[in-house]
């Protein structure tokens, strides 16, 4: 009986978790995805578009700065930034974005995505001006919740 109850509760919790995932709707929101690995980019774009995001991509930090700097104020709702990339890494790019004169450069949520999830790595990303740190492989629910928290809290 206890086993059946635990199983039923587990299924109920799983269904509740699935329902929570389906609640996210980012229609009309725009994100800049900065990732040098093509497979990671394709997977992330698929995950983001499935929840309504429109997505621009950049393969390195320098390209991300160029795209962000050319965008109109408020065009991007968030930036997802890999840390280790060629040409310019994510920490340097985030720091440079924070120093741009673009109107939302100081406030746009920049979220690190990296395999490096030690306390020291998290501190480095925050020191560079990033708002949050997601460990790879990215868990979709955690990604959506983090984006929701930053984007919709910012809209209030």
Region spans (language model):
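C-terminal compact regulatory domains
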Residues: 1-156
């Amino acid at each position: 009986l206890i086993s059946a109850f635990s199983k039923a509760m587990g299924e109920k919790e799983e269904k509740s978790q699935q329902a929570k995932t389906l609640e996210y709707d980012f229609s009309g929101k725009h994100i800049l995805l900065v990732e040098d690995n093509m497979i990671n980019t394709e997977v992330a774009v698929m995950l983001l578009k499935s929840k309504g995001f429109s997505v621009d991509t950049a393969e390195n930090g320098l390209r991300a700065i160029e795209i962000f700097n050319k965008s109109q104020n408020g065009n991007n709702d968030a930036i997802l930034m890999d840390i280790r990339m060629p040409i310019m890494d994510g920490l340097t790019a985030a720091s440079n974005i924070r120093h741009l004169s673009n109107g939302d450069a100081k406030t746009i949520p920049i979220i690190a995505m990296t395999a490096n999830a030690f306390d020291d790595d998290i501190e480095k990303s925050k020191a560079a001006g990033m708002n949050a740190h997601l460990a790879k492989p990215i868990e979709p629910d955690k990604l959506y919740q983090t984006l929701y928290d930053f984007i919709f809290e910012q809209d209030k």
